[in-house]
């Protein structure tokens, strides 16, 4: 059984957060939105006390700072889709673990494309990890095989090397 995708929305505008939540759930009702956060401080605290979600939707301009400050204060291993009204931060955003950069107002088709991109990338990574594990099993040269065998010959036991 596939685990539900866990998502965090970091957005200081209540209407924008509500609209994004609705659009995500329309795209896939199975996506679990585990937190909606409004500030850098609240986000840093949340990431320090909770496991990283699969995906973060992140506005850049938050009430207390630019969201990039989150990454200076706490390790975030989640994939990120930036959602912002400002295009000037795109290069900086893609230097992080950014999957996409959506300009507000977010259009359904662009959100769907970003979520599909995330699913494709994570599917690719999962397949790559499986292939690597299979390769490691096949090519395991460190594996030790038995060098001695005992066999019964009549009433005696003989050792073979």
Indicate where each model-derived feature is located.
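Non-catalytic signal-transmission and effector/linker regions of two-component phosphorelay proteins
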Residues: 1-6
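Hydrophobic/aromatic residues located in beta-strands of well-ordered beta-sheets
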Residues: 7, 33-34, 80
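Conserved acidic carboxylate
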Residues: 11
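Charged phosphotransfer/docking patches of two-component systems
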Residues: 14-18, 90
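Charged docking surfaces used in two-component/phosphorelay signaling
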Residues: 18-26
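CheY-like receiver
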Residues: 26, 42-46, 53-135
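Short hydrophobic/Thr-rich beta-strand motif most characteristic of the beta2 strand and flanking loop
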Residues: 30-40, 46
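Conserved binding/recognition cores within well-folded domains
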Residues: 120-161
């Amino acid at each position: 059984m596939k685990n539900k995708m866990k998502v965090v929305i970091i957005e200081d505008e209540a209407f924008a957060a509500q609209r994004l939540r609705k659009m995500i759930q329309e795209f896939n009702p199975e996506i679990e939105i585990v937190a909606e956060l409004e500030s850098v401080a609240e986000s840093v605290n949340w990431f320090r006390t909770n496991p990283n979600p699969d995906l973060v939707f992140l506005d850049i301009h938050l009430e207390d700072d630019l969201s990039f400050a989150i990454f200076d204060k706490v390790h975030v291993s989640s994939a990120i889709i930036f959602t912002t009204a400002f295009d000037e931060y795109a290069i900086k955003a893609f230097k992080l673990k950014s999957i996409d950069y959506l300009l507000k107002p977010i259009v359904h088709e662009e959100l769907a494309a970003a979520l599909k991109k995330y699913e494709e990338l994570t599917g690719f990574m999962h397949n790559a990890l499986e292939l690597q594990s299979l390769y490691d099993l096949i090519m395991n040269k460190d594996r030790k095989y038995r060098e001695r065998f005992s066999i019964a010959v009549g009433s005696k036991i003989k050792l073979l090397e």
